[in-house]
Amino acid sequence: MKELLYYTFIETEVTGAFLVFREKTQNLVFASLGNDKLFLLGKVEGFLKKHEKQDTMYDLQELKEAETYKKSIENYTICLENKMPLPSGAIPFEFLFGTDFQRKVWNELLNVEHGHVATYGDIAKRIGKPTAARSVGRACGSNNLALLVPCHRIVGSNRKLTGYKWSCKLKEQLLNNEKENSLSLSRL
């Protein structure tokens, strides 16, 4: 069985984003950050090939008619530019990939609010695995829904920035933008 996935690339002042939608559900299933569209396309193609299931092959096509996905794309751009925290459900997404443990971690990351951070150890405790901070870190590194599953809000036990799949510099910029945005919103 072939499953159709559509991709598009957006550019913002912060960075670019490569977005992949599942045609069957119209949900976002992959969001990767960076400015090199061809590099990101190659990464996604390699990832999909690696994760093809016995009975499912993925057909990745460029999104030509964006009307169905227009609102999600607009909201992701807002999210990337950190103009405001988006309400839950503003961008429908789903975990098409990932182990049960990874999905448990990713679901817990959804509870780390805009403008706040948590440690890998905090997340490990919240999912009932208090000694699994390193495994939580690996799950964060496997997150393929950048920003929506906010792994950029997770820091080391010393509260310092640690690795980020898309660069520590970008992680710092995203956190600073969220912090500024949260302060601006609290003044209203």
From Swiss-Prot:
Upregulation: In contrast to some bacterial and mammalian enzymes, MGT1 is not induced by alkylating agents.
Pfam family membership, one: DNA_binding_1
E.C. code: 2.1.1.63
Catalysis performed (reactions): a 6-O-methyl-2'-deoxyguanosine in DNA + L-cysteinyl-[protein] = S-methyl-L-cysteinyl-[protein] + a 2'-deoxyguanosine in DNA; a 4-O-methyl-thymidine in DNA + L-cysteinyl-[protein] = a thymidine in DNA + S-methyl-L-cysteinyl-[protein]
Active site: C151 (nucleophile)
Localization per Swiss-Prot or TrEMBL: Nucleus
GO biological process: DNA repair; methylation
Alphabetically ordered keywords of this record: DNA damage, DNA repair, DNA-binding, Methyltransferase, Nucleus, Transferase
GO molecular function, a single term: methylated-DNA-[protein]-cysteine S-methyltransferase activity
A GO cellular-component term linked to this record: nucleus
Listed InterPro entries: MethylDNA_cys_MeTrfase_AS (IPR001497), MethylDNA_cys_MeTrfase_DNA-bd (IPR014048), MethylDNA_cys_MeTrfase_DNAb (IPR036217), WH-like_DNA-bd_sf (IPR036388)
Annotated SUPFAM superfamilies: Methylated DNA-protein cysteine methyltransferase, C-terminal domain
Residues in the signal sequence: none
Binding residue positions for DNA: Y120, G121, R134, S157
Family listed: Belongs to the MGMT family.
Matching NCBIfam families: ogt (TIGR00589)
General remark: This enzyme catalyzes only one turnover and therefore is not strictly catalytic. According to one definition, an enzyme is a biocatalyst that acts repeatedly and over many reaction cycles.
Protein function: Involved in the cellular defense against the biological effects of O6-methylguanine (O6-MeG) and O4-methylthymine (O4-MeT) in DNA. Repairs the methylated nucleobase in DNA by stoichiometrically transferring the methyl group to a cysteine residue in the enzyme. This is a suicide reaction: the enzyme is irreversibly inactivated. Prefers double-stranded DNA over single-stranded DNA as substrate.
Record-given protein name: Methylated-DNA--protein-cysteine methyltransferase
Source species: Saccharomyces cerevisiae (strain YJM789)
